[in-house]
Amino acid sequence: MATTYNNLYLDTRARLRKAGIDAAQLEARELLCYASDKSREQLYRDMSLYVSAELERRVEELVQRRLAGEPVAYIVGEWEFYGLPLDISSDVLIPRSDTEVLAERAILRARAAGEGGRVLDLCAGSGCVGLAV
């Protein structure tokens, strides 16, 4: 049976929600974007279009990985932090949204220090805070 991007998204979101994944809406969108090689804007634009059987299979593989407990950031290999897209692998911790508060405070302190201020990001995992600052 032919499936649209919208139906595939809704099904993926429902399965993630049923599994107790809090950010099911965001994660379903990220998995579909990754599987289809589309930006968020392209995905929203194409919601009424039909998907190929190959794309359905690809999304199913990704959903199975997620349901097995693999974080979506590791599946797609990218995560956004403070508006910056970062390459992510299992070698680094996934930047968390609450760490953006730390980045914001560091930015404010750096600005307050003026031109002579310096910032050192030492042994900081992915380096996301240093990049944001």
Sequence positions of predicted segments:
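Non-catalytic accessory regions of SAM-dependent methyltransferases
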Residues: 1-42, 48-51
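Conserved AdoMet
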Residues: 32-109
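Alpha-helical structural motif
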Residues: 1, 8, 55-59, 68, ...
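Conserved SAM/SAH cofactor-binding pocket of Class I
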Residues: 100-133
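A general structural signal for well-ordered alpha-helical segments in protein cores
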Residues: 9, 28-29, 59-60, 72, ...
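Generic leucine side-chain signal with a strong bias for well-ordered alpha-helical environments
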Residues: 16, 26, 32, 43, ...
